[in-house]
Amino acid sequence: QKMRKWRIEDSEELYNITGWGTSYFGINDKGHVVVTPRKNGVGVDLKELVDELQLRDVAAPMLIRFPDILDNRIEKTSSCFRQAAEEYGYKAQNFIIYPIKVNQMRPVVEEIISHGKKFNLGLEAGSKPELHAVIAINSDSDSLIICNGYKDESYIELALLAQKMGKRIFLVVEKMNELKLIAKMAKQLNVMPNIGIRIKLASSGSGKWEDSGGDASKFGLSSSELLEALDFLAVSYTHLRAHETGAYLV
């Protein structure tokens, strides 16, 4: 039996390009991968681009970035949340936070910070080394810095010292011992900490991340621990207010 000629549609199905490429990647009539960073914008033939780079003596492997895709995803995230907020009557201020563990390369993070400024975009660090990187790269004093992950004294100290330097830093508490350590370090450094609390919801959702909720989830404070934390903060705040004014709980 004679085999039929391979078609563009066969390549699209084989590589599932419509599944992961969203509206950015596709296959043109030459059978080449084409990228369209902006909706209704000009497409770039990646095969022709690589050929042109090789003519300029640029050898493989090559790392090709498309900042417009980053910009467009930031805009899309902000737009979707804004629409949902309008639909459900959500009135509070909100911020987009980018975890730098996703991609720590400086050009990527700088592009995200630059374009995200008008969308209240901040950065998240999950460790002391990541916090060092965030502090160094994020010069916007109005941008939020969220500290997650395991917190020892040195990590907390760095966050509090950065706060004293004018950074808007929030330490997110996942365990009671972290809260007590933050209060201890804040008193030593004479600073009123900005504290966030991760809550372990009793009800779990559905889908891929359903195990991250519910009483059996690994992260966050239970309802009883939350009450304990609030009582602890009420007592600690009376001690800290002698040094600073103002407190934040998110």
Question: Residue locations for each model-derived region?
Answer:
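A charged N-terminal "starter" segment
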Residues: Q1-I195, A216, S223, L227-D231
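Flexible glycine-rich active-site/ligand-binding loops centered on an Asp-His dyad
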Residues: G205-E225
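Acidic-enriched catalytic cores of C-N bond-cleaving enzymes acting on peptides and small amides
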Residues: V235
